Amino acid sequence: MKVITLLTDFGLKDPYVAQMKGVILSIAKDVKIIDISHEVHPQNIEQGAFLLYTSIPYFPKGSIHVAVVDPGVGTSRKGIIMDCKDYTLVGPDNGLLVPAAKRCENFKVYEIVSKKYVLDKITYTFHGRDVFAPIAAYIANGISLADIGRGIEDYMDFNLEFGKVCEDKIEGKIFHIDRFGNLVTNIEEGLIKRYIEYGKEIDLIIKGRKYRVKFLKSYGYSKEGEILLTIGGIGFLEISVNKGSASRELGASIGDRVTLVL
């Protein structure tokens, strides 16, 4: 059974995600559809790219990943397929898919050109349902990418910005905030552990305010209500509050800069 995943900024209040799933199942009846997230901040391509990039390794080989964070929908921007060794990516040509594609050594990019494998009526504002969902379904059914599109090299490139060391500081930013209010940063586990040991106290600067915090293995090693640093399940530094919300406590938002003073 083929797996098709969905990642969007559509939310679940409206019928958009359900319509995409309906289109997929009308074409490929035996696929398994899995939601990665539909709570990407509206039009935030970087956040969407990060969530896709960090989710890819946990799906079976041959999975088809549809990602739609598409502020340029209905314009001249292309729809593309990125063919990687172990998975396929479908979505808009705006950089959203590229970090996930770069996880594999080599990939090919196809511009979606065939009208045969999309809906008869394509709206200007909902290519997720009208283009990308049916394309993913037909790929799951075994239609070759060469029949759907043409190979291109002029796709929009994009690289995620990861945390880095600047003199005696580690600089990063918030990529994502989960439902617990944890601030998921772009600072990778390997970088943190190169400079900071578990149990060490350091200064955290965020939104111009300084906090003295500990780097701990998990929440339970801190006191209730205490701010802490930990490595989250996807391998990046998170700023948390034990049994609380770091987002609310620190007044932080996606895109805010984070500084750790070594």
Can you annotate each of these PLM segments?
Residues 1-76:
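N-terminal glycine-/serine-/threonine-rich phosphate-binding loop
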Residues 6, 33-36, 67, 89-92, ...:
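General beta-strand structural signal in soluble alpha/beta enzymes
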Residues 10-14, 72-74, 177-182, 244-246:
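Short acidic, Gly/Ser-rich segments with clustered Asp/Glu that frequently serve as metal-coordination loops
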Residues 15, 19, 28, 43, ...:
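Conserved active-site and cofactor/substrate-binding residues in soluble primary-metabolism enzymes
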Residues 27, 47, 60-62, 67-68, ...:
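Active-site histidine-anchored catalytic micro-motif
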Residues 119-187, 191, 196:
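Anionic-ligand-binding alpha/beta catalytic cores of soluble enzymes and soluble regulatory domains
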Residues 186-251:
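A conserved acidic, glycine/proline-rich C-terminal tail/linker
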